[in-house]
């Protein structure tokens, strides 16, 4: 006849105290996360609400506008003036982002494949060197980059801006490398036995299997020029408003002489800039998350 041991009163008390402590920590953790979410969401909500305000300038007395209108969106999209050239800025940014998306994606995937799947002399040294370089912020090289572009007559040009974005993209290969490390070696070896070159293995075997990391790389490559202000401001410094990107144009609307007339339109522009990125994330969210998690697993 089997008997079941009954926990002593002391053990039961310890278990109860452990559950209470765990519950308290869980409540505190969720409260902290809720506070952080609130702090993060309030400026976004204010930007969105202000974009529908009938007031042209900043109104600190109200969080929710007294009256709502779509005029700010209509004005910034269909009525460009000497200050607000939003449709032109949007197209300039879109062109730079699309070109950089294609070039940077190719660079990142090729570098990641070479480091992950190819064995050559100096591979480890190159990998460690790239990781070390990534530890330093890109702004440290701004002056050198500017003078190089000036020497090549590429300042105030989209080609120079794209070159800067694409040229630095290859160093962000680590997540992609982690994903390529999970591709079975047997597949590549079988392809080599059939006479396939490294290029054919890369384009016909590895890339079709790498849709999550491909989406992740495409989104990141598109986001870099879409949200960048510092490099764009440094390179596109001619003062001609029609040559600006969205970030520079919207920043210009916050000048002291303009902010009381253009702030609500600035908010509308901020919302419009976020729409393409939001749609991109909603459509490709599944692949984006898969690319991060699978790439970080071994990377």
Give the role of each language-model region.
Residues 1-12:
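Short, intrinsically disordered terminal tails adjacent to the first/last structured region
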Residues 6-8, 18-21, 25-299:
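A structural signal for multi-pass alpha-helical bundles of membrane permease subunits
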């Amino acid at each position: 006849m089997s008997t079941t041991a009954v926990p002593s009163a002391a053990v039961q008390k310890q278990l109860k105290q452990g559950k209470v402590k765990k519950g308290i920590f869980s409540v505190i953790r969720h409260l902290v996360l809720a506070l952080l979410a609130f702090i993060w969401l309030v400026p976004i909500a204010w930007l969105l609400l202000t974009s529908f305000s009938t007031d042209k300038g900043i109104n600190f007395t109200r969080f929710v506008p007294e009256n709502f209108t779509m005029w700010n969106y209509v004005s910034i999209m269909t009525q460009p003036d000497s200050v607000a050239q939003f449709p032109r800025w949007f197209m300039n940014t879109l062109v730079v982002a699309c070109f950089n998306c294609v070039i940077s994606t190719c660079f990142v995937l090729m570098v990641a494949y070479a480091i992950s799947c190819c064995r050559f002399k100096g591979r480890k040294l190159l990998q460690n060197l790239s990781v070390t370089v990534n530890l330093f912020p890109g702004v440290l090289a701004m002056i050198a980059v500017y003078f190089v572009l000036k020497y090549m007559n590429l300042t105030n040009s989209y080609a120079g801006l794209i070159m800067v974005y694409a040229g630095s993209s290859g160093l962000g290969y680590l997540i992609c490398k982690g994903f390529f490390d999970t591709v079975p070696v047997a597949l590549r070896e079988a392809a080599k036995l059939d006479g396939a070159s490294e290029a054919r293995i890369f384009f016909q075997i590895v890339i079709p299997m790498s849709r999550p990391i491909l989406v992740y790389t495409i989104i990141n490559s598109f986001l870099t020029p879409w949200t960048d202000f510092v490099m764009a401001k440094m390179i596109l410094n001619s003062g001609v408003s029609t040559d600006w990107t969205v970030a520079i144009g919207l920043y210009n609307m916050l000048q002291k002489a303009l902010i009381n007339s253009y702030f609500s339109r600035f908010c509308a522009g901020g919302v419009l800039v976020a729409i393409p990125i939001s749609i991109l994330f909603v459509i490709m969210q599944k692949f984006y998350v898969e690319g991060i998690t699978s790439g970080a697993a071994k990377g």
